[in-house]
Amino acid sequence: GEKMQKIRLAAMRLKIRIRPVEKAEYAQTIAALCGAEDAREAAYTGAGFEDEMLVMANFPAGMMNTFLGLFRRMGIAPVALKAMLTPTNAAWDSEKLHEELAGEHRAMTNGEGKRHQG
């Protein structure tokens, strides 16, 4: 949609390659989806999820902040579930990464709510 087009434009400005992931690819490891290893023969049969996720891989120092700052300047709504490729999450599939990021996001959101209540 429109948000994806804006994200592509932001990425092009910084010479970042964007790769959308289709539901059929959710069984692949995050490393394979990021091009860090070969894809495996694996069919995804799960229910999937609707939340958008953003995984950043091979970003030089400071690039993530520059990229996300460009989101703000271009009026692109934040992506709540985002991660850098790490040795830990590289072996996960999309569903496992989604589960972990959604849990972290809920914990942060709940934590902020509690802090404001006093």
Predicted regions and their residues:
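Gly/Ser/Thr-rich loops at beta-strand to alpha-helix junctions
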Residues: 1-3, 60-63, 88-92
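Surface-exposed interaction/gating patches
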Residues: 1-7, 108-113, 117
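N-terminal, charge-rich interaction modules
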Residues: 1-36
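Basic helix-extension-helix modules of the SAP/HeH family
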Residues: 31, 57, 97-100
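Mid-chain, well-packed structural core segment of small domains
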Residues: 43-74
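Ser/Thr/Gly-rich flexible loops in soluble cytosolic domains mediating phosphotransfer, phosphorylation
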Residues: 68-104
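A polyampholytic, Gly/Pro-enriched intrinsically disordered region
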Residues: 38-46, 99-111
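Residue-level signal for secondary-structure boundary elements
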Residues: 19, 79, 105-109, 113
